[in-house]
């Protein structure tokens, strides 16, 4: 004879009583794997409160972090890529563009805006890694070029936030042209004596590193960012040697003289405002 008898076979909850967490309410830190509430992430500028890992975010979040009261005027919002080469890999390039636009809500891998940081005017161009790996195509180059022209015309400092896997292979030479195009525009910005600040975030690689990302009057990076040209695996296979510990991290690049500062995202707005005030005076 059983000591206990279960009167009810199981516990059931009516559908009306069930409560589900809304999508996007919780995130997991890629570094320490701890759960992060979206409200805490927003308050902490998308930096893990446990291990200080800087989560990858896009232009929407950077504009939110940097611009006063999240107020800004978006510049050149309707530029979209063509397909002059009729490129097809696993799928047609035009189809890939349409899918990326639907998935991200973006027109391409960059957005540009004019706003204020602690009262100081600033033009910001920010790349989005979620759009085809933040790859640099003709629209990315054109938006940067037009943003620089806008900065020169209105005499406003320019901030470039890079986050990219490099040149967009689907546009071939049209993509590579953007390296020279943006570098030439930055030379005009320098001639006009207008400050250019380059912020390198995780990851900044390929043709972006080899052009505008490293040409700032001040080059800044976020902690732990991957910064380089070719990837570490490709380099290791080429030179047949083990790479130094921490190779291609922001800290390694700073130590070897290619960066001026590493700045925590939570202090970024104040640091940028200080630079702007210093350069204006």
Swiss-Prot record:
Keywords: ATP-binding, Cytoplasm, Fatty acid biosynthesis, Fatty acid metabolism, Lipid biosynthesis, Lipid metabolism, Metal-binding, Nucleotide-binding, Transferase, Zinc, Zinc-finger. It holds the Pfam family Zn_ribbon_ACC. It is an enzyme of class 2 (transferase). Its cofactor is Zn(2+). GO terms for biological process: fatty acid biosynthetic process; malonyl-CoA biosynthetic process. Residues 1-23 are annotated as: Disordered. It catalyses: N(6)-carboxybiotinyl-L-lysyl-[protein] + acetyl-CoA = N(6)-biotinyl-L-lysyl-[protein] + malonyl-CoA. Its main location: cytoplasm. Residues 25-281 form the CoA carboxyltransferase N-terminal domain. It comes from the Bacteria. Pathway: Lipid metabolism; malonyl-CoA biosynthesis; malonyl-CoA from acetyl-CoA: step 1/1. GO terms for cellular component: acetyl-CoA carboxylase complex. Its EC number is 2.1.3.15. A zinc finger (C4-type) spans 29-51. GO terms for molecular function: acetyl-CoA carboxylase activity; ATP binding; carboxyl- or carbamoyltransferase activity; zinc ion binding. Zn(2+) binds at residues 29, 32, 48, 51. InterPro entries: AcCoA_carboxyl_beta (IPR034733), Acetyl_CoA_COase_Trfase_b_su (IPR000438), ClpP/crotonase-like_dom_sf (IPR029045), COA_CT_N (IPR011762), Znf-ACC (IPR041010). It is found in: Cytoplasm. Belongs to the AccD/PCCB family. Acetyl-CoA carboxylase is a heterohexamer composed of biotin carboxyl carrier protein (AccB), biotin carboxylase (AccC) and two subunits each of ACCase subunit alpha (AccA) and ACCase subunit beta (AccD). This is Acetyl-coenzyme A carboxylase carboxyl transferase subunit beta. It comes from Pedobacter heparinus (strain ATCC 13125 / DSM 2366 / CIP 104194 / JCM 7457 / NBRC 12017 / NCIMB 9290 / NRRL B-14731 / HIM 762-3). The lineage of its organism: Bacteria, Pseudomonadati, Bacteroidota, Sphingobacteriia, Sphingobacteriales.
